[in-house]
From Swiss-Prot:
This is Photosystem II reaction center protein K. The keyword Chloroplast applies. PSII is composed of 1 copy each of membrane proteins PsbA, PsbB, PsbC, PsbD, PsbE, PsbF, PsbH, PsbI, PsbJ, PsbK, PsbL, PsbM, PsbT, PsbX, PsbY, PsbZ, Psb30/Ycf12, at least 3 peripheral proteins of the oxygen-evolving complex and a large number of cofactors. It forms dimeric complexes. One of the components of the core complex of photosystem II (PSII). PSII is a light-driven water:plastoquinone oxidoreductase that uses light energy to abstract electrons from H(2)O, generating O(2) and a proton gradient subsequently used for ATP formation. It consists of a core antenna complex that captures photons, and an electron transfer chain that converts photonic excitation into a charge separation. The gene is psbK.
Length: 61
């Protein structure tokens, strides 16, 4: 349990304190991927919502 907590803390610290993480831009050769990359963080939320819709369709068995 403590090891998992330490790993989560390390990951959070590395993402929160690296300023290049939030402001990084793609190279010009890959600029056409920008719209796809803007949508990618939403995809896991859609799968989460799909699970509820699926359970509602089968009446929460």
């Amino acid at each position: 349990m403590l090891n998992i907590f330490c790993l989560i803390c390390i990951c959070l610290n590395s993402t929160l304190y690296s300023s290049s993480f939030f402001f990084a831009k793609l190279p010009e050769a890959y600029a056409f991927f920008n719209p796809i990359i803007d949508v990618m963080p939403i995809i896991p939320v859609l799968f989460f919502l799909l699970a509820f819709v699926w359970q509602a369709a089968v009446s929460f068995r």
